């Protein structure tokens, strides 16, 4: 026996074979760069990125995990999402979220002695 034959015998057949085409069933594959919606029965979260949600609209980026009623799938994606009332950008699992914050800053008052 050669060494390659020993290696082939050591690996179980179920690890070498491709999965059947019908294993995905009703779960469509999400394409990279797509924005994921949070709607009835679907919850999406992002691992390895920082972000925020305002008013129920969320962004995703980096590597996301989609949890449905029947399955959990890992979806690698690089994308830009939307946060209501502000701007967000996702680049390589690092996010920058900017929004308008209005605060009153009073100017320095001069004393009459100056």
From Swiss-Prot:
Entry protein name: Transmembrane protein 263
Gene Ontology CC terms: membrane
Subcellular location: Membrane
Pfam families to which the protein is assigned, alphabetical: UPF0444 (PF15475)
Family statement drawn from the similarity comment of this UniProt entry: Belongs to the TMEM263 family.
Alphabetized UniProt keyword annotations: Membrane, Transmembrane, Transmembrane helix
Keyword Transmembrane attached: yes
Range of residues in the leader sequence: none
Functional description taken from the UniProt entry: May play a role in bone development.
Record InterPro entries: UPF0444
Membrane topology: Multi-pass membrane protein
């Amino acid at each position: 026996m050669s060494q390659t034959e020993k290696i082939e015998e050591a690996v179980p057949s179920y690890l070498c074979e491709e999965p059947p085409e019908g294993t995905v069933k009703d779960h469509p594959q999400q394409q990279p760069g797509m924005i994921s919606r949070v709607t009835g029965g679907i919850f999406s979260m992002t691992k390895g990125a920082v972000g925020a949600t305002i008013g129920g609209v969320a962004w995703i980026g980096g590597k996301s995990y989609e949890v449905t009623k029947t399955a959990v799938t890992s979806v690698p994606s690089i994308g830009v999402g939307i946060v209501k009332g502000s701007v967000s950008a996702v680049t390589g699992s690092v996010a920058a979220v900017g929004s308008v914050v209005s605060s009153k800053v009073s100017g320095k008052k001069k004393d009459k002695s100056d």
